[in-house]
Amino acid sequence: PPELKAVHPLGKSPVVTEGAATVIEFGAIIDYVLRHHGAGDLAPAANTPEYDTYQQWLHYAEGSAMLPLMLFMYVGRLGEAGAPLHPRIESEISNHLGYVEGVLAGRDYLMGAELSAADIQMSFVGEIVGAFGRYAAYPNIAAWVKRFQDRPAYRAALAKGGPYNMGPKD
């Protein structure tokens, strides 16, 4: 829309502006907000192995995990014309969701016992699994999504921004 083009040449959201800074892309926005306004409790300390893993999750969400899920959605609109692509897309979905499912085995959150910004960045991936009706195949992902959706801050954000299709169904 023209309003967003006035803020950034790509005219896309999300976008955050603050002073001279204009930041696009969820991962970059999360990083910016935490560095400028965070209390230090949503990311591990920099220059640690945990921070490296955390950074991986910030980039993995949109760099790898979302692609097969989005392709599944788009190719589904092609009907029979998209049928030849489904096996490869399904293979990639299984590969990525299997990876996340395994990481979450025995953990409450991606980085361990505590919620981090990595969970926030990956939240849409988890929620879309439910929207696609796949929680039965990925119980650790389903439990993780329920945990973060049950958090008071998540509920407060929904109350402020309004419900959306991927949100809790209670």
Predicted regions and their residues:
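Short secondary-structure boundary/hinge segments and terminal tails
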Residues: 1, 33-34, 147, 165-167
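GST-like domain detector, emphasizing the conserved glutathione-binding G-site
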Residues: 1-91, 101
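Phosphate-coordinating loops and pocket residues in cytosolic domains that bind phosphorylated ligands
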Residues: 6, 150, 159-160
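Conserved residues at the C-terminal ends of beta-strands
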Residues: 19, 123, 160
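Active-site-flanking alpha-helical
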Residues: 34, 125-126, 158
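GST-like fold's C-terminal all-alpha helical module
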Residues: 58-152
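Terminal-tail/helix-coil boundary detector
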Residues: 154-170
